[in-house]
């Protein structure tokens, strides 16, 4: 029941989230560059990739050795939640791996995300 109420509230707030994203995007263009990621779209199709989520800049820096360990034959997607995290992740890993914003926590967006990417781990 709680999840249903959460999803309904989230759905009602989506216009506010988009407005907030546009305001942030006016200050930091990176927020707008991957706006489709926020709704579960705009990803490059990969072959059973490994998803690593690093919320912020500190976590992006912290996964460096982990990413090196998993590289090789594995396709890796690095997801972030902040513009500074995205910028640093693109700088460190963007030449070899896909770097994206994780979609907003709404079941439709998350389902689109996982269905399209077909994540292995």
Give the ranges of each region predicted by the language model:
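Active-site and donor-binding regions of nucleotide-sugar-utilizing enzymes
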Residues: 18-121
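Membrane-interacting alpha-helical segments
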Residues: 2-9, 13-16, 20
């Amino acid at each position: 029941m709680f999840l249903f109420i959460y999803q309904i509230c989230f759905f009602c707030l989506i216009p506010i989230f988009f407005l907030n994203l546009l305001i942030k995007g006016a200050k930091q263009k990176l927020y707008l560059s991957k706006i489709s990621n926020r709704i579960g779209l705009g990803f490059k199709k990969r072959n059973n990739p490994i998803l690593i989520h690093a919320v912020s800049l500190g976590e992006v820096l912290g996964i460096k050795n982990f990413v090196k360990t998993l590289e090789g034959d594995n396709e890796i997607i690095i997801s972030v939640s902040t513009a500074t995290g995205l910028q640093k992740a693109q700088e460190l890993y963007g030449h070899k791996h896909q770097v994206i914003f994780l979609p907003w926590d709404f079941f439709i967006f998350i389902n689109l995300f996982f269905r399209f990417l077909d994540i292995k781990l």
